[in-house]
């Protein structure tokens, strides 16, 4: 998150013009400030890191509900038998983890020439930032499930 924050700060502090026309210096300078690869890569890394966090969170949820792993009642219900307890939350956690894992697949390496071949590289930064936002949203939901399950386990 810190690396992504720094990349955003760097991007906001730079001018994306190429070439940069500096009237006060009577100069025209070529620049690479139009290239947002650093920003794209830091958000890709954040998404991948969150996918690892999601996998461990989902695994903890499953283990807390398994008597073999936790010495707690199955699905955290004292009633046993046909009582589902928190079993349905496993399905939601598994679905969220799968969505996060899918969204974390790198997008930035999949680019095509744009602007009729004038611009040969587009790092897909807006799409990467958006998918990282979607990952973070799902991660908050998964964390909420883990907290509820952990609270029930303590209870």
Named regions from a protein language model:
Residues 1-55:
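Accessory "access/gating" subregions that flank catalytic or transport cores
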Residues 37-155:
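C-terminal catalytic subdomain
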